Amino acid sequence: VFADASARERLNAIVHPAVMADFDRWCAGHAEDDYTVFESAILFDAGLDGGFDVTVAVVAPLALRLERTCRRDSASPDEVERRIAAQMSDDELVERADYTLVNINRDDLAADVSELDRRFRISKSERDATD
């Protein structure tokens, strides 16, 4: 489906409503949590970003993405490149997201995620104080 935009749209029209309904049910059981996270490589592409307070882009250099995805999925570089080509560019993703994390190595990413967690918890505390 990555090479066929029409087939991808038909598939997304089936999958995305079910995924969002499942996420809504999951969130109902976590209403007291400080915040919840929804992971999606195609959040903006699918037009799902409107239902979220904050968006976070996670990007990495193309060569590293290719290497990681080929290894993870046992896929060829050509197949992975087709997937990436079917998605929004990193430049547009970063432009649209509220925050951006760069995933080059685990230690730096973990530190950046911890900082983002701290910010989200402070924001939650500030919202609670005004309620």
Labelled PLM ranges:
Residues 21-29, 35-71:
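ATP-dependent NMP and nucleoside kinases share a basic, alpha-helical "lid"
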Residues 3, 43-44, 108:
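Glycine-/small-residue-rich active-site loops that bind phosphorylated ligands and cofactors
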Residues 7-10, 39, 54, 82, ...:
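Residue-level recognition of specific faces of alpha-helices
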